[in-house]
Amino acid sequence: MAKAKRVFTLLLRLIAFGTALVAAIVMATSHESGSFFTVSYEAKYSDTPAFKYFVIVNAIVTVYSFLALFLPSESLLWRLVIVTDVVFTMLVTSSISAAVAVAQVGKKGNSHAGWLPICGQVPKFCDQVTGALAAAFISLITYAILLLYSIHTVLNPLLLQKT
């Protein structure tokens, strides 16, 4: 049973690692140029602070997820890992929220502010941003499941002990 728990945890951490890595790479490589009559323009992730934040958070989560893969199952650091999982789950949530807000404005524009949508002019860029957001959502769901499972496995023996 303990081996099955370890395998399940490793599988979830591998999925979280992979999806966070994909999200960071896809967003960091999102770039497209275009022109409208004689005006040239360029869309890249680094033009938007929310997208930069998204890449940084997913890069940090990727490194953390990779390092957590090598933590021995008997280690007392797992309680600290649970706290860190909570922090990183919140960071991923905030980075996705910020990036989705900016992506929505890029896709639909904002008629009240006079902002025009840009996805018609730079569809490849918008597709890459959408792909990065999809990978990050999978990472977030995986982290939420991992967090609940970790809390259950670490705290359950403590709750069942007789005092």
From Swiss-Prot:
Residues 1-6, 74-79, 152-163 are cytoplasmic. It comes from the Eukaryota. Keywords: Cell membrane, Membrane, Transmembrane, Transmembrane helix. It comes from Ricinus communis (Castor bean). This is CASP-like protein 1C1. InterPro entries: CASP/CASPL (IPR006459), CASP_dom (IPR006702), CASPL (IPR044173). Belongs to the Casparian strip membrane proteins (CASP) family. It is a multi-pass membrane protein. The keyword Transmembrane applies. Homodimer and heterodimers. It is found in: Cell membrane. The chain crosses the membrane at residues 7-27, 53-73, 80-100, 131-151. GO terms for cellular component: plasma membrane. Residues 28-52, 101-130 are extracellular.
